[in-house]
From Swiss-Prot:
Binding site for Zn(2+): 567, 571, 669, 673
Protein name stated in the entry: Alanine--tRNA ligase
Record note on cofactor: Binds 1 zinc ion per subunit.
Cited HAMAP family: Ala_tRNA_synth_B (MF_00036_B)
Domain notes: Consists of three domains; the N-terminal catalytic domain, the editing domain and the C-terminal C-Ala domain. The editing domain removes incorrectly charged amino acids, while the C-Ala domain, along with tRNA(Ala), serves as a bridge to cooperatively bring together the editing and aminoacylation centers thus stimulating deacylation of misacylated tRNAs.
Record-linked SUPFAM superfamilies: Class II aaRS and biotin synthetases, Putative anticodon-binding domain of alanyl-tRNA synthetase (AlaRS), ThrRS/AlaRS common domain, Translation proteins
Any one GO molecular-function label of the UniProt entry: zinc ion binding
Family: Belongs to the class-II aminoacyl-tRNA synthetase family.
A Pfam family recorded for this sequence: tRNA_SAD
């Protein structure tokens, strides 16, 4: 059998499918673009959904790709098994309404078995199929597959809610009896038993039905366009070709493991327990790629996932004896392994290393904070007389502070406490269920719209025009084509149009359709791209219109001009962000409306006030310099040579539009813009905020709206000046600071008075010393506002030799708080409070020198105080 590197496998896959007329789709960003159903790109088909649901018609219906993907619903299994990964590569081939079952199976078999390609031994391949799908069974038989190698399984039907669905046929490679220690054999496949012998290497989904949850599967309707969706895991193929026992011994992971060996001084033993090595190697791959694609560690969403991965890897580093930040040192190795197809990791290496190292250092501080939380938690439990740490608290230590259960167990054991493991596992399961529920499987598609997909008439958007005459080519009303319509809403396609279809963050034009006499026959309320790319006008009709007639199309120029100002300002803002906070601040989303612009970008912290000031100043400088805005059409290679910034996630054809603003900004953009930056007038940032982990948002205004914003601020400042009796606006800051200083002085004075009062009260309490069995003690009820004040009393008591034991009781609201402190080796504070607390219907516990309890019966406070002497 061939011995192939991972790069050779990937290239051979793409070359084979190119030979079958497929176009290669580049690997997309791991952060989904315009798809809120996905946390991550989690399969090869996830980026092709627009083709499968018919909302966009691809240039070539045959597509192949090698797609980096992330799945995180089973993080805890990574490192425990031979094949679980967070980040992996999915190799795929796809047919959008072109070839179907026969070709997919035949070509798949050719790729797997031909000496020119993978050359797998045929007797090592097994296939599963859906029992009712005899067409697939017969196709495999026709290709020479033995019937004993074809296994029917009920699970071989791909379906997620409503939408495209169908049977699938999976291909397995038999690794032999060495991987079947109990000699179970083919039953491993037949009974779907988890095993290391029969490795699934490829799944071919035959998408031929529109699933409808309301009817039985046998009544599903056939899709108008049948599709092929396949996926093969590169890591699994590499393990087979390289004769590796697990995926981790392949050229995709082993170089990382070797680096970890150097850092830790430990040795990776293929036959031993190497979980920590595997976790680190897997997680740093996911971190490197995800951060390189713009996701950053944080407390929610994608950021939470990355933070969890980093902390898990860091904890496993500690298990290997690594005490300093080290994960960032592995980024270069990841980049070197993947450079041939994914150069972006090395290109962004410095930034990725900076983020990873910073997060490692932050985690070290968090571990310290977590230890404090754990100690306080156990103090509280002791005060309440409890000895078991609740499962949800264990989960919080694990989830928030990165404490592995073993670490929490060690801390608890030191305090004589146990763990609620069942509760922890329940909390963990809840989190996993939430994670799974938030992820829609990558292949999930919407229903196909056959009517819109069938529109093939050509239509051209004409730049620079606000009105023109056009022939009406298509009318769609009530989801059906018609020759004429007179009322309600309809979708229209013209042979040409001045209306911009919503795209690239720029909203659609609004306007009117007029007849030959100048009367308005329809109001355009939206324009979107049809599946084949034509501008599709949504209109409200006020008169009858017919296909073949000529109409005048007029856009609302005021709306267009406002949008253009904001769109050009967005380009200036993007460039300013690069210059001031770094080139990592790339666009993550934008909206250019008539009255404002919204720009989302990747950044790992809030933009400071000073940075915002510099950004605003720099953008306005470009506006006031009156720079011509030049748009040219060219090929993509020339555009890149010009230094044009391409937005990750946008798909560009061979011909592109390049928008240049002097030497300040060069971007690929299909939108409309002002002719000169001076037309923008002025630019003002209204707000900067975080909208998710690693993503910031700026909302800004231009022109008239910016003037109004400045005027509103001036009016507000005048109102403040009047309130604080400042004669001039420019004196407001000094006046406010003077008032603030007065407040601070009064607060200090108030605090000092409180401290004197507390000291006086403590002095009175500490004078009342009694004796019982040779032990000096103080037992008193005090008036305090919170339990913390009791500790302050105790701290003051410890500083001088007032007595051997202190017992304080306070009624706070409807609760009774009890504190016992002891300097005597004969009196254990924790034991004493366990006796006293029940008197006030409470319970508690603690250490020998300090203990606290809570109760509810304030009427028994004096009884408690009277009983102290009898218990010393």
């Amino acid at each position: 059998m061939k011995n192939l590197s991972s790069a050779q496998i990937r290239q051979m896959w793409l070359d084979f499918w190119k030979s079958k007329g497929h176009s290669v789709e580049p690997s997309a960003n791991l952060v989904p673009v315009n798809d809120p159903t996905l946390l991550w790109i989690n399969s090869g088909v996830a980026t092709l959904k627009k083709y499968f649901d018919g909302s966009v018609i691809p240039d070539n219906p045959r597509i192949t790709n090698a797609q980096k993907s992330i799945r995180t619903n089973d993080i805890e299994n990574v490192g425990k098994t031979a094949r679980h990964h967070t980040m992996f590569e999915m190799l795929g081939n796809f047919s959008i309404g072109d070839y179907f079952r026969d070709e997919a199976i035949e070509w798949g078999f050719e790729l797997l078995t031909s000496p020119e390609w993978f050359a797998f031994p045929k007797d090592k391949l097994y296939m599963t199929y859906y029992p009712d799908d005899m067409d697939s069974y017969n196709r495999w038989i026709a290709l020479g597959v033995e019937p004993s190698h074809l296994i029917p399984l009920e699970d071989n039907f791909w379906e997620i809610g409503a939408g495209p669905s169908g049977p699938d046929t999976e291909i397995f490679f038999d690794r032999g009896t060495d991987f079947d220690p109990e000699n179970i054999g083919i039953r491993l496949l037949e009974e779907d038993i988890e095993n290391d012998r029969y490795i699934e290497i490829w799944n071919i989904v035959l998408s031929q039905f529109n699933a409808d949850p309301a009817v039985p599967r046998s009544e599903y309707k056939e899709l108008p366009n049948k599709n092929i969706d396949t996926g093969a895991g590169l890591e699994r193929l590499a393990a087979i070709f390289q004769g590796a026992k697990t995926n981790f011994e392949t050229d995709l992971f082993l170089p990382i493991i070797r680096e970890v060996e150097k850092i830790s001084g430990k040795t990776y033993d293929q036959d031993g327990d190497n979980m920590s090595f595997k976790v680190i190697a897997d997680h740093i791959r996911a971190l490197s790629f995800a951060i390189g694609d713009g996701a950053l560690p944080g407390n929610e969403g994608r950021g939470y996932v990355l933070r969890r991965l980093l902390r898990r890897a860091s904890m496993h580093g500690q298990r290997l004896g690594i005490t300093e930040p080290f994960l960032y040192k592995l980024v270069e190795t990841v980049g070197n392994i993947m450079e041939s197809y994914y150069p972006e990791v090395l290109e962004k290496r410095a930034f990725i290393e900076k983020i990873v190292k910073s997060e490692e250092e932050s985690f070290a501080r968090t571990i310290h904070t977590g230890s404090q939380f754990a100690e306080q938690l156990m103090d509280k439990l002791a005060a309440e007389g409890k000895s078991e740490i609740d499962g949800r608290d264990i989960f919080k230590l694990y989830d928030t502070y990165g404490f592995q259960v073993e670490l929490t167990e060690e801390l608890a054991e030191h305090r004589g406490m146990t763990l609620d493991i069942a509760g922890f596992e329940a909390a963990m399961k809840e989190q996993q269920d939430r994670a799974r529920a938030s992820v829609v499987k990558g292949g999930s598609m919407g229903m196909q719209n056959e009517t819109l997909a069938a529109i093939t008439e050509e239509s051209t958007f004409v730049y620079g025009q606000t009105a023109l005459e056009a022939s009406l080519s298509v009318i769609v009303a009530d989801n059906a084509r018609t020759e004429a319509v007179s009322e309600g809403q309809a979708l229209l396609v013209f042979d040409q149009t001045p209306f911009y279809a919503e795209m690239g963050g720029q909203v659609a034009d609004h306007g009117f359709v007029k007849n030959a006499t100048g009367d308005i026959v329809a109001t355009v309320i939206d324009v979107q791209k049809a599946p084949n790319g034509q501008p599709l006008h949504t209109v409200e009709l006020s008169a009858s219109i017919s296909v073949g007639q000529t109409y005048t199309l007029e856009i609302e120029t005021k709306r267009r001009k406002g949008v253009e100002k904001n769109h050009t300002a967005t380009h200036l803002l993007h460039a300013a962000l690069h210059n001031i906070i770094g080139e990592h601040a790339t666009q993550a989303g934008s909206l250019n409306e008539q009255d404002f612009l919204r720009f989302d970008f990747t950044h790992f912290e809030a933009v400071t006030a000073e940075e915002l000031r510099r950004i605003e100043e720099e953008v306005n400088e470009q506006i006031w310099n009156a720079i011509p805005v030049v748009t040219v059409e060219t090929d993509i290679d020339t555009a890149k040579e010009m230094g044009a910034m391409a937005l990750f996630g946008e798909k560009y054809g061979k011909e592109v539009r390049v928008v240049t603003i002097g030497d300040y900004s060069v971007e690929l953009c299909g939108g409309t813009h002002v002719g000169n930056t001076a037309e923008i007038g002025i630019f003002k940032i209204l707000k900067e905020e975080g909208i998710g982990s690693g993503t910031r948002r700026i909302i800004a205004v231009t022109g008239r709206e910016a003037f109004l914003a400045y005027r509103d601020q001036e009016d507000a400042l005048k109102e403040v000046a009047a309130t604080i009796k400042s004669p001039q606006i420019k004196e407001v800051p000094n006046k406010v600071e003077s008032l603030a200083q007065q407040v601070r002085d009064l607060q200090k004075e108030n605090a000092a008075l409180k401290e004197k009062a507390a000291a006086a009260a403590a002095g009175d309490v500490f004078k009342n010393v009694k004796d019982a069995n040779g032990i000096r003690y103080i037992a008193s009820q005090v008036q305090v506002s919170d339990a913390g004040a009791l500790r302050t009393f105790a701290d003051n008591w410890k500083q001088k030799d007032y007595s051997d034991v202190l017992v304080l009781v306070a009624a706070i609201g409807d609760k009774v708080n009890v504190l016992v402190a002891s300097k005597s080796s004969d009196v254990h504070a924790g034991n004493l409070i366990k006796v006293l607390a029940p008197i006030v219907a409470g319970r508690g516990g603690g250490k020998p020198d300090m203990a606290m309890a809570g109760g509810s019966d304030a009427s028994a406070i004096q009884t408690l105080l009277n009983s102290v002497a009898n218990n010393l």
